[in-house]
């Protein structure tokens, strides 16, 4: 037994030299081995197996150290000029907030700085993006700067596509992918550093991840968390993580002139929104002609609420006989071959018609002008009707300023706002976090599956209202995800078999319940078609 104790001590000493994921496996194997030591006649053989596993785990880490990719930084990027400060902050703090204007280079350069700070050896550097399009584009950019093919040192994973390898150091992914990984890797031991990018968007996934990561950091002091954000209230992230340091990085910007070009007011003010929607194509065309006539040729980025509006606008501008002008769409679900056209060299003038994916997630090159109608589709949940919708709403001042910042990177720019200065001044400073305007059923279901306790005490940056929580719980009970109970505390609710199955489906719980029932009734194929339409 004394020899076995010495063996156990030797194995435990190796924990600091192997990956965090292998350390968990090694610890589990050792614990199991010690439990049966007195009864198992093959104990020596199992000790040899564990010693071999530990040696191989050590070799894997050494191989990662020896094969680190060559790191370089474009000298003209503002974030590169803060290189030493950022690397030092990452090395000396568990959480770092990096706030930077669009065009500062933070998205593509911070992962490499994490690698230089010693991350990526005993785990992967995970880098989340709100959109699949951005995850792929950023991965391609970082791999290109490192002079490597995508999928080697740098890879990406989005729904239905995994372009990573066991040798990858940096893994781009959507925040939804990281969220799904918590179900089988609750302490996220595959990672030694996590970067939450575009955190200012405050989507439901981002807010839940930031709350979840706060609990993980307490259990994993070696895990690094980097939060990158546009210059929109970075202090809220710092407060949430015990006054974590904030590093502010300026962008490469030239002066941007703002021109207000509001529509003519209708006689009946109640028809204002309808009139605006009908006149929008004419207003965009008018703004484009103004820019070309008054300021000279240049590429134009036009923000529109959604795909339908983009396709309608393409049809309208296509009939406007704009000679020498190429019109391209940009939205998250666009085919990758069409997305790549945005980044290719061209002659003449381009009009890029984009959703708010181009607001912060993607930097469209060569933009000199921006046309901003001042609207976007925002997810809203109605407690009265129990329905979530995507109405077109006015954007906040912060979003308007983000859009303005998309031009003025290659020279002085012009932003035409298709609304008045008075309208801008009356707008909200920031967009409400999605968690305050959404149905929380999916979040509550995920929390129950992860045994995270009471929703009300979970460390959200902005805690949801009690009514939202109650509505979410009631919906899940109606779907059969929870056993019926009189309690309102999540700890008092027990997931049913249906609830466990729903928590593994990456769709709204109501749609997931349709899928489960469809499978039960032998109508899965037909139900999947209906759910696909409802989920878009």
Residues covered by each model-derived region:
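P-loop NTPase motor module signature
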Residues: 1-514, 518-521
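Short secondary-structure transition/capping segments
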Residues: 464, 534-536
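C-terminal helical accessory/scaffold domains
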Residues: 524-534
């Amino acid at each position: 037994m004394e020899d076995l104790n010495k063996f156990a001590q030797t194995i435990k000493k190796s924990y600091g030299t192997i990956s965090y994921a292998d350390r968990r496996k090694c610890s589990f194997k050792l614990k199991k081995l010690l439990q049966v030591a007195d009864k198992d006649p093959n104990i020596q053989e199992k000790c040899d197996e564990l010693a071999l596993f530990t040696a191989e785990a050590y070799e894997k880490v050494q191989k990662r150290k020896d094969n680190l990719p060559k790191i370089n930084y474009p000298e003209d990027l503002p974030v590169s000029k803060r290189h030493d400060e950022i690397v030092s902050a990452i090395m000396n703090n568990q959480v770092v907030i990096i706030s930077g204007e669009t065009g500062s280079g933070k998205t593509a350069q911070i992962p490499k700085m994490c690698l230089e700070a010693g991350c990526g050896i005993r785990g992967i550097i995970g880098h989340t993006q709100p959109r699949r399009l951005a995850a792929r584009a950023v991965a391609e950019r970082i791999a290109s700067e490192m002079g490597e093919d995508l999928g080697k040192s740098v890879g990406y994973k989005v729904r239905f596509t995994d372009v990573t390898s066991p040798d990858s150091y940096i893994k781009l992914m959507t925040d939804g992918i990281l969220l799904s990984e918590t179900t089988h890797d609750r302490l996220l031991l595959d990672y030694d550093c996590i970067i939450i990018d575009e955190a200012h968007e405050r989507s439901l996934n981002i807010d839940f991840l930031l709350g979840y990561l706060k609990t993980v950091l307490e259990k994993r002091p070696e895990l690094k968390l980097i939060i990158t954000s546009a210059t929109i209230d970075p202090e809220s992230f710092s407060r949430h993580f015990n006054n974590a340091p904030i590093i502010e990085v300026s962008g490469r910007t030239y002066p941007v002139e703002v021109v207000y070009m509001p529509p003519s007011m209708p006689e009946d003010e109640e028809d204002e929104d309808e009139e605006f929607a009908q006149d929008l194509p004419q207003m965009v065309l008018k703004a484009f002609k103004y820019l070309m006539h008054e300021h000279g040729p240049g590429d134009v980025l036009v923000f529109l609420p959604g795909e339908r509006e983009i396709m309608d606008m393409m049809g309208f501008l296509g009939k406007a006989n704009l000679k020498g002008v190429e019109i391209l769409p940009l939205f998250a679900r666009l085919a990758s071959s069409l997305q790549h056209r945005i980044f290719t060299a061209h002659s003449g003038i381009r009009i890029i018609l984009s959703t708010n994916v181009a607001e912060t997630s993607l930097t469209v090159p060569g933009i000199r002008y921006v046309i901003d109608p001042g609207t976007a589709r925002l997810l809203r949940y109605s407690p009265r009707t129990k329905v979530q919708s995507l109405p077109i709403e006015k954007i906040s001042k912060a979003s308007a300023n983000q859009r303005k910042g998309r031009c003025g990177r290659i020279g002085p720019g012009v932003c035409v706002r298709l609304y008045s200065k008075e309208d801008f001044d009356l707008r909200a400073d920031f967009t409400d976090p999605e968690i305050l305007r959404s149905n929380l059923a999916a979040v509550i279901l995920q929390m129950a599956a992860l045994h995270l306790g009471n929703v009300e005490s979970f460390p959200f940056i902005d805690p949801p209202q009690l009514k939202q929580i109650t509505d979410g719980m009631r919906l899940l009970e109606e779907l059969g995800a929870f056993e019926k109970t009189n309690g309102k505390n999540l700890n008092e609710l027990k997931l049913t078999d249906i609830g466990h199955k729903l928590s593994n489906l990456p769709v709204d719980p109501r749609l997931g319940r349709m899928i489960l029932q469809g499978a039960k009734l032998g109508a899965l194929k037909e139900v999947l078609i209906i759910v696909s339409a409802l989920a878009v």
